[in-house]
């Protein structure tokens, strides 16, 4: 919809739709994040045309839910062209020329297919109902976490912000990987729990660390057990010894973590870790 006078001054939904569209008429338009007045002044404004629906996306299809790659993909392309350009001047111009510019020799050796609106397809890898619910819950939790992070970021020390930023990044990457089918839901939970265990340890949040570190080990044991079961169910040949050794090593590590949480249990904790290391050594020797 349109918002009348608001559209003329501010970055309204209509104006921002144009910014995210790949249609020829809308390309590189409406940069203003708050005031659209700047685009009107500098000639980059384009009003949304009711006869031409905005098609969202990028001209180089990302085809990924990876938040890291979504931010790095453009720079990776620039670095590729800069590296392969034969002229030193072209190596520099890659970084300062308008979007889409490429050295002639690079474009000849590494041609890109011409953009076509017919190629614009929604990136929608198949997801089971369980993964869809997992993604919904995870997104709600991550959105809450990002909100809490932004709320306190200006008063927290830089080191604390860096740690929590890394935790949120791991969480978002893991969720995207699950949605693409690259890792399982259990693997994502293990990575997220490990990130929280590391963060709470670094920040001295002992009680929370006592929760997340054993939880990480417990999820790892379940992950190994389910992997061993699925391998056995598929009838894949091979010894079960490595699986048993790995589960025993993880179990010993988990026991060591739990023992060390309580005063007076240092020796049992130390013994548990030593036993776990013996199982790890046996696992490595088994190949």
Model-identified regions with their sequence ranges:
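Short hydrophobic alpha-helical module
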Residues: 41-44, 143-153, 278-285
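Hydrophobic alpha-helical transmembrane segments
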Residues: 76-82, 110, 138, 160-168, ...
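Polytopic alpha-helical membrane-helix bundles and their juxtamembrane interface segments
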Residues: 189-287
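Membrane-interface helix-boundary signature
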Residues: 3, 124-134, 156-160, 185, ...
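Substrate-recognition/cap regions that form aromatic- and gly/pro-loop-enriched pockets
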Residues: 125-191
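Cytosolic/stromal cytosol-facing helical appendages immediately following the last transmembrane segment
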Residues: 2-138, 176
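Alpha-helical hydrophobic/aromatic positions enriched in membrane-embedded helices and signal peptides
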Residues: 5-6, 35, 174, 205, ...
